[in-house]
Amino acid sequence: MKQIIQDLKKGDTILEEVPAPRVKYGSVLIQTTRTLVSLGTERMLVDFGKANFIQKAKQQPDKVKMVLDKVKTDGLRPTLEAVFNKLGQPLPLGYCNVGKVVEVGKGVTEYSVGDRVASNGHHAEYVCVPKNLVAKIPDNVTDEEAAFTVIGSIGLQGIRLLQPTFGETIVVVGLGLIGLVTAELLLANGCNVIGFDFDPNKVKIAKEKGIIAINPSEGTNQVKFVESYTNNIGADGVIITASNKSNEIISQSANMCRKRGRIILVGVIGLDISRADFFEKEITFQVSCSYGAGRYDEEYEQK
């Protein structure tokens, strides 16, 4: 079968011919009909692969510390061999998959052959996915629409953590795919939604969906706009779906909030937080983990 993989050592993105997976206990084998490319996450992986070793190290300083610790315990040569072996392993891309179940593993009673399902499977003709990371697709939902399921669940988890109530004013910073979906979900929840993005095309799409969308590069001060909109009270909450290394985003988000406002980070930004920005308003800050409870928990995902 064909599968898209990323070579982290050379930086190449390859359509590779690989063996089809076999169904495992507690999993289902899915024949793919659609996959969705997540530009932010997958572009980040591609850019990481294209970077040289020094650039890779700068992008992942926490991993550098792990390597240095390993050098101290195992020595330089074994450590370098381990690093090169790790980078040499092909990385499957993609996590928004739609298809039909073609085989059901032992221990699975929730799904049957022929079911249309959405999952976090890769860009591949066939994927084997644990049952808890699979969901049936309603008959009135197309495959193209269902391909956005995982993207939507990432935004939805940020909203769960924020716990917005009807009529609250929520700011979404970053109107990429996840940001737009998050903003729409907030609108459906009865919130007043303000969105910020520097891309005029994304701002245009957001406005068409009923979001109060602003492009700061056109001269609008984000903090002052929120203050004006809320009669100098501030936003009840901010969800950050942007991807940017700057620390300015977290500072601006705090300044947009009212006293005891909430900030949820869904994206990836600089986090050199100023105590003063959070102290006087007693602002709550939390990082959202992927698409919710159970993610990265082996007991939930694999058993």
Question: What is each model feature region?
Answer:
Residues M1-N85, Q89, G121:
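Short N-terminal strand-loop motif that marks the start
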Residues R34, D115-R116, Y126, T169, ...:
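Residue-level marker of beta-strand positions
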Residues P92-Y95, N120-N132:
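A structural motif shared across PLP-dependent enzymes of the aminotransferase-like
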Residues Y111-S112, P164, C257:
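Short, well-ordered loop/turn sites that connect or cap secondary structure elements
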Residues R116, E145-G219:
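Mid-domain Rossmann-like dinucleotide-binding core that forms the NAD(H)/NADP(H) cofactor-binding site
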Residues G121, D197-F198, C289:
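Conserved acidic E/D residue at the C-terminus of a beta-strand in Rossmann-like folds
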Residues K204, K209-S288, G294:
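Glycine-rich cofactor phosphate-binding loops and adjacent beta1-alpha1 units
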